Curated annotation (Swiss-Prot):
Family to which this protein belongs: Belongs to the FGGY kinase family.
Domain of life where this protein originates: Eukaryota
Protein role: Highly specific D-xylulose kinase which participates in the catabolism of xylose. Xylose is a major component of hemicelluloses such as xylan. Most fungi utilize D-xylose via three enzymatic reactions, xylose reductase (XR), xylitol dehydrogenase (XDH), and xylulokinase, to form xylulose 5-phosphate, which enters pentose phosphate pathway.
Binding site for substrate: 97, 168, 284-285
Protein name, per record: Probable D-xylulose kinase A
Binding of ATP, residues: 366, 471-472, 475
Lineage, opening ranks: Eukaryota, Fungi, Dikarya, Ascomycota, Pezizomycotina
């Protein structure tokens, strides 16, 4: 006998694919359908989901491609036998910062869709501009400089909007659009983020932006809970603030708000119930922290090619090197994010040098690296009072801190606070195995201090749990050092949701929005239903008394080292 309980869909519209994932009330995944843009689309000369204009550093996607993809994913779910009439709620996740420009006829086209035709056939004319800038776009340096200067400096911009200006952020992108294509801007009735674009298709009219994703624009004043009028003025230029406000629309506070019933088109074409509710879609990073009941002060570290650090926190302490967003479901919490360009690649450089020296040459094995790292004492200190070894290892230019590619090695004496740039006493590459992982983790601890609280029992402030995801999370030696530095009173866990974190987070958000009791938080409802044993495995201890405190001293030297390198680099220019 097949179950007839409610189902929920979470979509993930990323750079290279659209995914639709279906869960039941118990959060069990029952269907997944994917549409790979390069492999499955027709009529677009895209590569890895995007088009590029090298001359102007532009990277963008044809919006019509996403229309094709939505029909493609729903067809895939139909082939799998999904009973669409059981779907009670739909939410989504979209690649952050991207913008979609709707024409004046968009609302009427969305309302009058013919279910016998595809979305692409009917909506290609709904856009004043056929492309959406991608997060990899780097065409807005001039606009970023203006945004950074406009409120007095990058610190002031970060204080107001949660981030300093970045090429990919929507505000600088809209400013460039307004100047480069004034006629297009004039004809634009509404501007959506990728997430609210997806919700708009499902709803049949333009959906509001989500309270978390709106923080990736450099336009939303996070503390005031409203658009920053001065920044809107910069962005709108001669077209005026009121016009831009109309284009952007109001932003509801409640991340679980029922925006309305599903568009009739999907009821007729796929058999959805006309009572199916559409919920706000959020950004891909906010959706990632919804893929588990991440408690305030828990930390999530993605150890991929690059390193990303996510944390849910009640403390708003913005800085130009970090990002703050409103939490996607829980008022009073913020999502803190750090993005580094150097991650796995930097660790692999050291691994390869160690393997070459030991004669295992082209081997991709981590065995020697791990063994040496675990045999090396914390901070390479030979004695308790000996000097600490620390360094920066950047095979590619870094953004946190903002510095060119290169390597810098130092020793630091915590007793006298003396820092010396030197390679004396360094046994390379062996000493670098531990030093590279320590360098990456100390940077995370430095930038997240002040956001954690004591987990109780008289422990120093630290995360309750540290969750590791991505390729590097398979490495238990790295996990051990991560726990020694970052802490984690409950330990260090490997989170394994495959590459489905964003879609799962969106689906869980839909479950919460429809099934919550009055005042029930996302963390509470999902926490009761989430089957920990299916998704996580404890792979290392976290907090260790004495070791954690020693690394606290190392953080002070690490901060000093970064400042010295930045000063030296500024002098070189």
């Amino acid at each position: 006998m097949t179950s007839q309980g409610p189902l929920y869909i979470g979509f993930d519209l990323s750079t290279q694919q659209l995914k639709g994932l279906v869960v039941n009330s118990e959060l069990k995944v029952v269907h997944i359908s994917k549409f790979d843009f390069d492999a499955d689309s027709h009529g677009f000369s895209i590569k890895k989901g995007v088009l590029t204009n090298e001359a102007e550093h532009e990277v963008f996607a044809p919006v019509a491609l996403w229309l094709q993809a939505l029909d493609g994913v729903l067809n895939g779910l139909r082939k799998q036998g999904l009973d669409f009439s059981r779907v009670k709620g739909i939410s989504g996740a979209g690649q952050q910062h991207g913008s979609v420009y709707w024409g004046e006829n968009a609302e009427s086209l969305l309302k009058s869709l013919d279910s016998s035709k595809s979305l692409e056939e009917q909506l290609s004319g709904a856009f004043s501009h056929p492309f959406s800038p991608n997060w990899q776009d780097a065409s807005t340096q001039k606009e970023c400089d203006e945004f950074d200067a406009f409120l007095g400096g990058p610190e002031q911009l970060a204080e107001a909007t949660g981030s300093k200006a970045h090429h990919r952020f929507t505000g600088p992108q809209i400013l460039r659009m307004q100047r480069k294509y004034p006629e297009v801007y004039k004809k634009t009735a509404r501007i959506s983020l990728v997430s609210s674009f997806l919700a708009s298709l499902l709803l049949g009219h333009i959906a509001p932006m989500d309270i978390s994703d709106v923080c990736g624009m450099n336009l939303w004043d996070i503390k005031k809970g409203a658009y920053n009028e001065k920044l809107l003025g910069l962005c709108a230029g001669p077209f005026g603030v009121e016009d831009l406000k109309r284009k952007l629309g109001a932003v509801p506070e409640d991340g679980g708000l029922r925006l309305g019933k599903i568009n009739r088109y999907f009821v007729e074409r796929y058999g959805f119930s006309s009572d199916c509710e559409i919920l706000p879609s959020t950004g891909d990073n906010p959706a990632t922290i919804l893929a588990l009941p991440l408690r305030p002060s828990d930390a999530m570290v993605s150890l991929g090619t690059s390193t990303t650090f996510l944390m849910s926190t009640p403390n708003y302490k913005p800085d130009p090197a970090t990002h703050f967003f409103n939490h996607p479901t829980t008022p009073g919490l913020y999502m803190f994010m750090l993005c580094y360009k150097n991650g796995g690649l930097a660790r692999e450089h050291v691994r390869d040098a160690i393997n070459e020296k030991s004669g295992s040459g082209a081997s991709q094995s981590w065995e020697s690296f791990d063994k040496i790292m675990l045999e090396t004492p914390p901070m390479g200190q030979k004695t308790e009072s000996g000097p600490m070894k620390m360094g920066l290892f950047f095979p590619r230019p870094e953004i946190v801190p903002n510095v060119r590619s290169g390597q810098w090695r130092f020793t630091y004496d915590p007793a006298s606070d003396a820092l010396t740039e030197t390679e004396d006493g360094w046994n390379t590459p062996s000493d670098e195995a531990r030093a590279i992982v320590e360098s990456q983790m100390l940077s995370l601890r430095l930038r997240s201090r002040g956001l954690t609280q004591s987990p109780g029992d008289g422990l120093p402030p630290q995360p309750r749990r540290v969750y590791l995801v991505g390729g590097g999370s398979k490495n238990k030696a790295i996990a051990k050092v991560a726990g020694e530095i970052l802490g984690g009173s409950d330990g260090v866990y490997k989170l394994d949701v495959g590459d489905n974190a964003c879609a799962l987070g969106a689906a869980y958000k839909a479950v919460w929005a429809i099934e919550r009791k009055p005042g029930q938080t996302f963390e509470d409802l999902i926490g009761q239903r989430w089957r920990e044993e299916e998704f996580i495995e404890k792979i290392a201890d976290g907090y260790q008394k004495g070791v954690f405190e020693k690394y606290g001293k190392a953080v002070e030297g690490f901060e000093k080292m970064e400042q010295q390198v930045l000063k030296q680099e500024a002098a070189r220019k």
